[in-house]
Swiss-Prot record:
Domain of life: Bacteria
Alphabetical UniProt keywords: Fatty acid metabolism, Isomerase, Lipid degradation, Lipid metabolism, Lyase, Multifunctional enzyme, NAD, Oxidoreductase
Cross-referenced InterPro entries: 3-OHacyl-CoA_DH_CS, 3-OHacyl-CoA_DH_NAD-bd, 3HC_DH_C, 6-PGluconate_DH-like_C_sf, ClpP/crotonase-like_dom_sf, Enoyl-CoA_hyd/isom_CS, Enoyl-CoA_hydra/iso, FA_oxidation_alpha_subunit
Enzyme active site: 451 (for 3-hydroxyacyl-coa dehydrogenase activity)
Residues involved in substrate binding: 297, 501, 660
One Pfam family recorded for the sequence: ECH_1
Described function: Involved in the aerobic and anaerobic degradation of long-chain fatty acids via beta-oxidation cycle. Catalyzes the formation of 3-oxoacyl-CoA from enoyl-CoA via L-3-hydroxyacyl-CoA. It can also use D-3-hydroxyacyl-CoA and cis-3-enoyl-CoA as substrate.
Enoyl-CoA hydratase/isomerase as annotated region, ranges: 1-190
Disulfide links within the chain: none
Swiss-Prot/TrEMBL site (Important for catalytic activity) positions: 120, 140
The protein's name in its UniProt record: Fatty acid oxidation complex subunit alpha
Membership in a protein family: In the N-terminal section; belongs to the enoyl-CoA hydratase/isomerase family. In the C-terminal section; belongs to the 3-hydroxyacyl-CoA dehydrogenase family.
Pathway stated in the Swiss-Prot or TrEMBL entry: Lipid metabolism; fatty acid beta-oxidation
Gene: fadB
Length: 715
């Protein structure tokens, strides 16, 4: 062994060729933490000092190559002063440059995922051979930053500015054939041939058959574009990417600006430009929020994984109630490998459920994301039925019938008699108490809530609701099944609205107050969309359904009358009475028309103003900032209450629930991180300015205590 560390080893293979292997001890993946970077420096120095070494193959001892930088470690660095952070970045980059400058040829053998710093390591090599099972990419923009280990310098010089901009600004993972096509890798081979292919390539470079120094040279020079070509490439890209990313996500455009600024410099000066821009981005609130989301997501996955130890494997599932929701659940289960029975009480429901699943599958086939054979396999995994005949072998049943407690209780009690004693029953309810529904069951310990969000195939969140008598086995099995379906489960305790709807309705409450104060709902929508929401509250209410919102509002008012009950009629009441139910019947706050593709498109409908007139009680002058505060303060305070009441266990879960469940602006990080960004004391003072609007705007005693003590939700 030439070098041996805890993350990296260097050993001789044959004929002066060595293997530099990443294999971080005690971890399932390789990542660039301080230990790995230090050992890479030592390994490179060792290779440089050994004149007998003729070539280097870089490999991985794990199923992945390198997943990138250890963000949990590096996020602390982002708090350092700018100059210190720039110096640290350049010091790390010198390690990659020293590797690139070795006086021998180098080949990266990419066996699995190589992302971020993992791909940047590969770019520092002279050649790259990629397994057909691998994927590569630079996803840093998803964290609000851009590549900081030379990615903005080497990639454009290797594959051209246009291709590099597309890779870096999109932040997606790229398949082997796409990587080969643009020249990001030199060869793609079957996994079992990877080592031999890398060895063959390095031998040909060592022998002089391949000129590795000529291959390396473009990465060390300025970008090979003249002034006119640069202007065309960069200005066009900046305009297009700015339109795609929007003003709240600066990283993609900043990456292009950095490539442009560094275009006329050689590698070392270009790396200085990259470091300066990287530090600037790392300090933005968007980066801090998006990195916070990433860390929260890791915490969520860790918590969900902990349930695996006691979870029962769901080999056969069932859904009660077909229709669009049942069809979506059936599609999601079958497409992820769990066969499912789809039961309804009539043929129409079955047809609707199958049509929904088929529509989703055809969409995937049309986009090239699924083969026709796979589509047939998934459809075969959905078995429609009008009876309970085959329910004796079902491991978990999702009840998805109408949102009515008596109907749900009757259906659940009925199915309980048709399944095994240990079958888990899960109710897909958005507002009804799980403990209440459990009263109809003989085995309430086997019963939980499993709240899917609509549309099921698109929304990543599933709330798994623990009732008073739900067992840990039932919770664990439902969490594991949700994960198997490709969802992000969050376990919450039972209360009206659970987490997401309990927090959403105070937001709608703020909206109702604004409309009753004479504020134009179109203006409110525009301001909240500019704030970062995917759609404004009026449009969201139309999409959810005015009738659904009306029912949910009443449930929440009954559950929390002190702050959610309003004796005055509001916009949702008059729209409901006028049978303007939203998108579902073509008119709500807006009117809806089908576009050329048959997709619903909202249009202005002046007639709604007459409908709303009776609930406009005053004409109040409010600023754009007021509108944001009227909307956001109730949502944030209810999130705080959910955490204090133990409905959700951690701040991370609360914030992720809102991002995944209702589209809370990711660049703001979630409600609790949003409070942190303002400052807890400042937020309490802000809420107090709106105290006259009612109890929804009154901070809790505990939040006031946090403000007094200078505390925050995230350290």
């Amino acid at each position: 062994m030439i070098y041996e560390g805890k993350a990296i080893t260097v050993k001789a293979l044959e004929s002066g060729i060595v293997e530099l292997k990443f294999d971080l001890k005690g971890e399932s993946v390789n990542k660039f933490n301080r230990l790995t970077l230090n050992e890479l420096r030592q390994a490179v120095d060792t290779i440089k000092a050994d004149a007998s070494i003729k070539g280097v193959i870089v490999s991985s001892g794990k199923d992945v190559f390198i997943v990138g930088a250890d963000i949990t470690e590096f996020v602390d660095n982002f708090k350092l002063p700018d100059a210190e952070l720039v110096a640290g970045n350049l010091e790390a980059n010198k390690i990659f440059s020293d590797f690139e400058d070795l006086n021998v040829p180098t080949v990266a053998a990419i066996n699995g995922i190589a992302l971020g710093g993992g791909l940047e390591m590969c770019l520092a090599a002279d050649y790259r051979v990629m397994s057909t099972k691998a994927k590569i990419g630079l996803p840093e923009v998803k964290l609000g930053i851009y590549p900081g280990f030379g990615g903005t310098v080497r990639l454009p010089r290797l594959i051209g500015a246009d291709n590099a901009i597309e890779w870096i600004a999109a932040g997606k993972e790229n398949r082997p054939e796409d990587a080969l096509k643009v020249g990001a890798v030199d060869a793609v081979v079957a996994p079992e041939k990877l080592q031999d292919a890398a060895l063959e390539l390095i031998k040909r470079a060592v022998s002089g058959e391949f000129d590795y120094k000529a291959k390396r040279q473009p990465k060390l020079e300025k970008l090979r574009l003249n002034a006119i070509e640069q202007m065309m490439a960069f200005e066009t890209a900046k305009g297009f990417v700015a339109g795609q990313a929007g003003p709240n996500y600066p990283a993609p455009v900043e990456a292009i600006k950095t490539i442009q600024k560094a275009a006329n410099f050689g590698r070392d000066k270009a790396l200085e430009v990259e470091a300066a821009g990287f530090v600037k981005l790392a300090k933005t609130s968007a980066a801090q929020s998006l990195i916070g989301l990433f860390l929260n997501d890791q915490e969520l996955k860790k918590k969900a994984k902990a349930y695996d130890e006691i979870a029962k494997d769901v080999k056969q599932a069932a859904v009660l109630g077909a229709g669009i929701m049942g069809g979506g659940i059936a599609y999601q289960s079958a497409s992820k490998g769990t066969p499912i029975l789809m039961k309804d009480i009539n043929e129409h429901g079955i047809e609707q459920g199958l049509a929904e699943a088929a529509k989703l599958l055809v969409g995937r086939v049309d986009k090239g994301r699924m083969t026709a054979a796979k589509m047939a396999e998934v459809l075969n995994g959905i078995r429609p039925t009008l009876s309970y005949g085959d329910f004796g072998h079902v491991d978990l049943v999702v009840e998805a019938v109408v949102e009515n407690p008596k109907v749900k209780q009757a259906v659940l009690a009925e199915v309980e008699d048709k399944v095994k004693e240990d079958t888990i029953l899960a109710s897909n309810t958005s507002t009804i108490s799980i403990s209440l529904l459990a009263k109809a069951l003989k085995r309430p310990e086997n019963f939980v809530g499993m709240h899917f969000f609509n549309p099921v195939h698109m929304m990543p969140l599933v709330e798994v609701i623990r009732g008073e008598k739900s067992s840990e086995l039932a919770i664990a099995t439902t969490v594991a099944y949700a994960k198997k379906m490709g969802k992000n489960p969050i376990v919450v305790n039972d209360c009206p609205g659970f987490l997401v709807n309990r927090v959403l309705f105070p937001y709608f409450g703020g909206f109702a107050k604004l409309v009753s104060a004479g504020v134009d709902f179109v203006r409110i929508d525009k301001i909240m969309e500019k704030f970062g929401w995917p759609m404004g509250p009026a449009y969201l209410m139309d999409v959810v359904g005015i009738d659904t919102g009306h029912h949910g509002r009443d449930v929440m008012a009954e559950g929390f009358p002190d702050r959610m009950k309003d004796d005055r009629r509001s916009a949702i009441d008059v729209l409901y009475e006028a049978k303007r139910l939203g998108q579902k019947n073509g008119k709500g706050f807006y009117a809806y028309e089908a576009d050329k593709k048959g997709k619903q498109k909202k249009v202005a409908d002046p007639s709604v103003l007459e409908v709303l007139k009776p609930i406009v009680y005053e004409q109040r002058e409010v600023t754009d900032e007021d509108i944001i505060n009227w909307m956001m303060i109730p949502l944030c305070l209810e999130t705080v209450r959910c955490l204090e009441d133990g409905i959700v266990e951690t701040a991370a879960e609360a914030d992720m629930g809102l991002v995944y469940g209702i589209g809370f602006p990711p660049f703001r990080g979630g409600a609790l991180r949003y409070i942190d960004s303002i400052g807890v004391a400042e937020f309490v003072a802000l809420a107090d300015q709106y105290a006259d609007l009612g109890a929804l705007y009154h901070p809790t005693a505990k939040l006031r205590e946090m403000a007094k003590n200078g505390q925050s939700f995230f350290g």
